[in-house]
Amino acid sequence: MKRFAVVTLFPDAIDCWLQASVVGRARGRAFDVLYVNPRDFAKDRYRSVDDYMFGGGPGMLMRYDVLKPALDHAKILVQNPLVLALSAGGKVLNQEMCTILSSYEGDIVLLCGHYEGMDDRIFDHVDLEVSVGDYVLSGGELGAAVIMETVIRLLPGFVEKSDNVRKESFTNNLLEEPQFTRPREYEGKEVPEVLLSGHHQRIELWKKEQRIKRTLVQRPDLLTSAKLEPMDLQILRRVLTDMEKVKRAIFGEQSN
């Protein structure tokens, strides 16, 4: 069972997510979460965890003399920990990283900053800085929740039908195909006939073509590292040819 030790000022923010999320059902079976609050390691009667920056600057930084003992304690609670810090300058989280983290044999420590950030000295004790995207959050708790969910979903014991995970978007660096449920028709919008045909080979071919087409249109950057089989490449060429024909029909032969 993989354990996550989260260093955070706001453990309730993550615990509320766990209680509401589907991954919470696997707690105690596929994973567990422990919390370490840096405020418990504050040295003054006010339990201060932040202070003004040396050299000036807006906002407050979390103190190194509070973060370091909190991180040390978190590492004691788990086995062979990999320490990740949520950081805007970190390596951007993707499905490949999630797969690597899920297969890591030890446990994971997540260090969440708050306020204007953390005293930079704490990063000397971190194995990897991770960002969940190019935007600003007020703290690392949401990012930690994202990392945990993406990793937990890949752990043995989380999804009974592991095929569900393997077929999700990004698993092979391709987006999922369009998906439909009842009713078959509503307000003139119909489910593609092929999905109702009962012809499993045609259905699988349609799904594969739609995955490639959707990825090409919405996230072409993923195709550079996608694991494409010879048939996938044939489909990709056909889709590109069809798109070029449409482009010429709309813009003319000289379109670029």
UniProtKB/Swiss-Prot annotation:
Domain of life of the source: Bacteria
SUPFAM superfamilies tied to this protein: alpha/beta knot
Record field: catalytic activity: guanosine(37) in tRNA + S-adenosyl-L-methionine = N(1)-methylguanosine(37) in tRNA + S-adenosyl-L-homocysteine + H(+)
Record GO terms (molecular function): tRNA (guanine(37)-N1)-methyltransferase activity
Residue sites binding S-adenosyl-L-methionine per the record: G113, V132, G133, D134, Y135, V136, L137
Pfam families, per database record: tRNA_m1G_MT
EC number: 2.1.1.228
GO biological process, one term: tRNA N1-guanine methylation
Keyword Cell inner membrane found: no
GO cellular component term, pick one: cytosol
Keywords: Cytoplasm, Methyltransferase, S-adenosyl-L-methionine, Transferase, tRNA processing
Compartments (UniProt record): Cytoplasm
Family: Belongs to the RNA methyltransferase TrmD family.
Subunit architecture: Homodimer.
Described purpose of this protein according to its UniProt entry: Specifically methylates guanosine-37 in various tRNAs.
Name of the molecule in the record: tRNA (guanine-N(1)-)-methyltransferase
Source organism: Coprothermobacter proteolyticus (strain ATCC 35245 / DSM 5265 / OCM 4 / BT)
